[in-house]
UniProtKB/Swiss-Prot annotation:
InterPro entries: Ribosomal_bS21 (IPR001911), Ribosomal_bS21_CS (IPR018278), Ribosomal_bS21_sf (IPR038380). The keyword Transmembrane helix does not apply. GO terms for molecular function: structural constituent of ribosome. This is Small ribosomal subunit protein bS21. Gene3D superfamilies: Ribosomal protein S8. GO terms for biological process: translation. Keywords: Ribonucleoprotein, Ribosomal protein. PANTHER family: MITOCHONDRIAL 28S RIBOSOMAL PROTEIN S21, SMALL RIBOSOMAL SUBUNIT PROTEIN BS21. One of its GO terms (cellular component) is ribonucleoprotein complex. Belongs to the bacterial ribosomal protein bS21 family.
Amino acid sequence: MSKTVVRKNESLDDALRRFKRAVTKAGTLQETRKREFYEKPSVKRKRKSEAARKRKKF
């Protein structure tokens, strides 16, 4: 869980920018999108295998 405390004399935009950076760095949004729908283990293995094949191709 990312937590951002607004500093003294800091604008809300700056605090929001810091929060977004922290969330991105922690991978929270990616994890949420990945877990949004249930993925069967067979589909997960297939996706992982295709990603590895794609990486190996380059």
